[in-house]
Protein backbone atom coordinates (compact mmCIF):
# COMPACT_ATOMS: atom_id res chain seq x y z
CA UNK A 1 0.00 0.00 0.00
CA UNK A 2 1.30 3.42 -0.97
CA UNK A 3 0.53 6.67 0.82
CA UNK A 4 -0.26 9.21 -1.87
CA UNK A 5 -0.72 12.95 -1.53
CA UNK A 6 -3.13 14.51 -4.02
CA UNK A 7 -2.30 18.07 -4.99
CA UNK A 8 -5.03 19.65 -7.09
CA UNK A 9 -4.80 23.06 -8.68
CA UNK A 10 -5.07 25.08 -11.82
CA UNK A 11 -1.26 25.26 -11.99
CA UNK A 12 -1.52 28.28 -14.25
CA UNK A 13 1.49 28.24 -14.19
CA UNK A 14 3.02 25.75 -11.75
CA UNK A 15 5.76 27.45 -9.72
CA UNK A 16 8.48 26.76 -7.18
CA UNK A 17 6.04 27.36 -4.33
CA UNK A 18 3.95 24.39 -5.52
CA UNK A 19 7.05 22.20 -5.66
CA UNK A 20 8.26 23.33 -2.24
CA UNK A 21 4.86 22.62 -0.67
CA UNK A 22 4.61 19.19 -2.28
CA UNK A 23 8.11 18.20 -1.23
CA UNK A 24 7.65 19.41 2.36
CA UNK A 25 4.31 17.65 2.79
CA UNK A 26 5.72 14.43 1.36
CA UNK A 27 8.61 14.56 3.82
CA UNK A 28 6.65 15.66 6.92
CA UNK A 29 3.71 13.27 6.50
CA UNK A 30 5.78 10.36 5.17
CA UNK A 31 4.05 10.04 1.81
CA UNK A 32 5.42 7.83 -0.95
CA UNK A 33 4.28 10.05 -3.82
CA UNK A 34 2.60 13.33 -4.63
CA UNK A 35 0.19 13.31 -7.57
CA UNK A 36 -0.32 16.70 -9.21
CA UNK A 37 -3.88 16.94 -10.53
CA UNK A 38 -4.52 19.90 -12.85
CA UNK A 39 -8.16 20.98 -12.68
CA UNK A 40 -10.20 20.88 -15.86
CA UNK A 41 -12.72 23.44 -14.61
CA UNK A 42 -12.24 24.43 -10.98
CA UNK A 43 -15.71 25.20 -9.56
CA UNK A 44 -14.41 28.08 -7.43
CA UNK A 45 -12.56 29.89 -10.25
CA UNK A 46 -14.97 31.08 -12.92
CA UNK A 47 -13.91 34.70 -13.26
CA UNK A 48 -10.91 34.59 -15.58
CA UNK A 49 -9.46 32.96 -18.64
CA UNK A 50 -6.91 30.23 -17.98
CA UNK A 51 -4.13 28.93 -20.17
CA UNK A 52 -5.41 26.09 -22.31
CA UNK A 53 -5.55 22.74 -20.50
CA UNK A 54 -2.89 21.17 -22.73
CA UNK A 55 -0.47 23.99 -21.88
CA UNK A 56 -1.11 23.61 -18.15
CA UNK A 57 -0.52 19.85 -18.39
CA UNK A 58 2.75 20.36 -20.30
CA UNK A 59 3.91 22.92 -17.73
CA UNK A 60 3.21 20.53 -14.83
CA UNK A 61 5.11 17.79 -16.68
CA UNK A 62 8.06 20.14 -17.09
CA UNK A 63 7.91 21.26 -13.45
CA UNK A 64 7.92 17.78 -11.90
CA UNK A 65 10.06 15.78 -14.33
CA UNK A 66 13.18 15.80 -12.13
CA UNK A 67 11.49 14.47 -8.97
CA UNK A 68 10.84 10.70 -8.93
CA UNK A 69 8.28 11.11 -6.12
CA UNK A 70 6.08 13.46 -8.16
CA UNK A 71 3.58 12.24 -10.73
CA UNK A 72 1.07 13.86 -13.08
CA UNK A 73 -2.50 12.53 -12.75
CA UNK A 74 -4.92 13.59 -15.51
CA UNK A 75 -8.13 12.28 -13.95
CA UNK A 76 -9.79 15.72 -13.88
CA UNK A 77 -8.76 16.49 -17.45
CA UNK A 78 -10.52 13.31 -18.59
CA UNK A 79 -13.88 14.52 -17.29
CA UNK A 80 -16.07 17.28 -18.63
CA UNK A 81 -17.65 19.85 -16.36
CA UNK A 82 -16.55 21.16 -12.97
CA UNK A 83 -13.74 19.36 -11.13
CA UNK A 84 -15.21 18.42 -7.76
CA UNK A 85 -12.73 16.81 -5.38
CA UNK A 86 -15.26 14.27 -4.13
CA UNK A 87 -15.76 12.89 -7.67
CA UNK A 88 -12.00 12.72 -8.22
CA UNK A 89 -11.37 10.90 -4.95
CA UNK A 90 -14.20 8.40 -5.54
CA UNK A 91 -12.75 7.52 -8.94
CA UNK A 92 -9.16 7.29 -7.69
CA UNK A 93 -10.19 5.00 -4.83
CA UNK A 94 -11.93 2.70 -7.34
CA UNK A 95 -8.86 2.67 -9.61
CA UNK A 96 -6.36 2.22 -6.74
CA UNK A 97 -8.18 0.46 -3.87
CA UNK A 98 -4.91 -0.66 -2.28
CA UNK A 99 -3.57 2.89 -1.80
CA UNK A 100 -4.24 5.46 0.93
CA UNK A 101 -4.93 8.98 -0.29
CA UNK A 102 -4.37 12.34 1.37
CA UNK A 103 -5.55 15.64 -0.09
CA UNK A 104 -3.29 18.67 0.24
CA UNK A 105 -4.86 22.09 0.67
CA UNK A 106 -3.53 25.52 1.49
CA UNK A 107 -4.45 27.19 4.76
CA UNK A 108 -6.74 29.54 2.82
CA UNK A 109 -8.78 26.55 1.62
CA UNK A 110 -8.99 25.02 5.12
CA UNK A 111 -11.25 27.88 6.12
CA UNK A 112 -13.32 27.32 2.94
CA UNK A 113 -13.87 23.56 3.56
CA UNK A 114 -17.45 23.91 4.88
CA UNK A 115 -18.44 25.20 1.42
CA UNK A 116 -16.89 22.27 -0.49
CA UNK A 117 -19.23 20.11 -2.56
CA UNK A 118 -20.24 17.02 -0.49
CA UNK A 119 -17.62 17.77 2.16
CA UNK A 120 -19.07 15.27 4.67
CA UNK A 121 -18.76 12.42 2.14
CA UNK A 122 -15.26 13.53 1.26
CA UNK A 123 -14.13 13.55 4.89
CA UNK A 124 -15.16 9.89 5.16
CA UNK A 125 -12.98 8.97 2.16
CA UNK A 126 -9.77 10.91 2.64
CA UNK A 127 -7.49 12.69 5.10
CA UNK A 128 -6.86 16.36 4.42
CA UNK A 129 -3.44 17.90 4.95
CA UNK A 130 -3.56 21.63 5.58
CA UNK A 131 -0.43 23.52 4.57
CA UNK A 132 0.15 26.28 7.08
CA UNK A 133 0.77 29.74 5.66
CA UNK A 134 1.39 33.13 7.25
CA UNK A 135 -1.76 35.22 7.49
CA UNK A 136 -4.19 32.28 7.72
CA UNK A 137 -5.33 30.68 10.94
CA UNK A 138 -6.22 27.37 9.35
CA UNK A 139 -8.91 27.04 12.00
CA UNK A 140 -11.52 24.39 11.37
CA UNK A 141 -13.80 22.00 13.20
CA UNK A 142 -12.73 19.20 10.86
CA UNK A 143 -10.04 16.66 11.71
CA UNK A 144 -7.00 17.42 9.53
CA UNK A 145 -3.27 16.86 9.51
CA UNK A 146 -1.15 19.99 9.22
CA UNK A 147 2.24 20.53 7.64
CA UNK A 148 4.53 23.49 8.28
CA UNK A 149 5.68 24.72 4.90
CA UNK A 150 8.41 27.37 4.65
CA UNK A 151 7.03 30.71 3.54
CA UNK A 152 7.63 31.32 -0.17
CA UNK A 153 5.48 34.26 -1.18
CA UNK A 154 4.75 33.51 -4.81
CA UNK A 155 1.53 32.84 -6.68
CA UNK A 156 0.53 31.98 -10.21
CA UNK A 157 -1.29 35.32 -10.37
CA UNK A 158 1.92 37.20 -9.50
CA UNK A 159 3.85 35.29 -12.16
CA UNK A 160 1.23 35.96 -14.85
CA UNK A 161 1.24 39.67 -13.94
CA UNK A 162 5.04 39.86 -14.05
CA UNK A 163 5.10 38.19 -17.48
CA UNK A 164 2.44 40.60 -18.80
CA UNK A 165 4.52 43.50 -17.46
CA UNK A 166 7.68 42.01 -19.01
CA UNK A 167 9.33 41.66 -15.60
CA UNK A 168 11.68 38.77 -14.76
CA UNK A 169 10.31 35.58 -13.21
CA UNK A 170 13.69 34.03 -12.46
CA UNK A 171 13.67 31.84 -9.32
CA UNK A 172 9.87 31.92 -9.09
CA UNK A 173 9.24 28.94 -11.34
CA UNK A 174 11.31 26.08 -12.76
CA UNK A 175 13.46 26.99 -15.78
CA UNK A 176 11.70 24.33 -17.87
CA UNK A 177 8.34 25.99 -17.17
CA UNK A 178 9.74 29.44 -17.92
CA UNK A 179 11.08 28.14 -21.27
CA UNK A 180 7.70 26.59 -22.11
CA UNK A 181 5.89 29.86 -21.33
CA UNK A 182 8.26 31.81 -23.57
CA UNK A 183 8.10 29.28 -26.43
CA UNK A 184 4.30 29.37 -26.44
CA UNK A 185 3.90 33.09 -25.67
CA UNK A 186 1.67 32.41 -22.66
CA UNK A 187 0.46 35.23 -20.42
CA UNK A 188 1.82 37.96 -22.67
CA UNK A 189 -0.21 41.16 -22.80
From Swiss-Prot:
It is an enzyme of class 2 (transferase). GO terms for molecular function: ATP binding; nicotinate-nucleotide adenylyltransferase activity. Signal peptide: none annotated. Gene3D superfamilies: HUPs (3.40.50.620). The keyword Nucleotidyltransferase applies. The keyword Cytoplasm does not apply. InterPro entries: Cyt_trans-like, NadD/NMNAT, Rossmann-like_a/b/a_fold. Catalyzes the reversible adenylation of nicotinate mononucleotide (NaMN) to nicotinic acid adenine dinucleotide (NaAD). This is Probable nicotinate-nucleotide adenylyltransferase. It comes from Bacillus pumilus (strain SAFR-032).
Amino acid sequence: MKKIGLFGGTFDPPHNGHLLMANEVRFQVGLDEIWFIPNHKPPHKTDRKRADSRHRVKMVEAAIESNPHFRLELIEMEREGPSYTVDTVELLKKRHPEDEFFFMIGADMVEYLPKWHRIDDLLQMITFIGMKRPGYTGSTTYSLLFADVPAFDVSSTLIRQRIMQEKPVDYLLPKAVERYIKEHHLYES
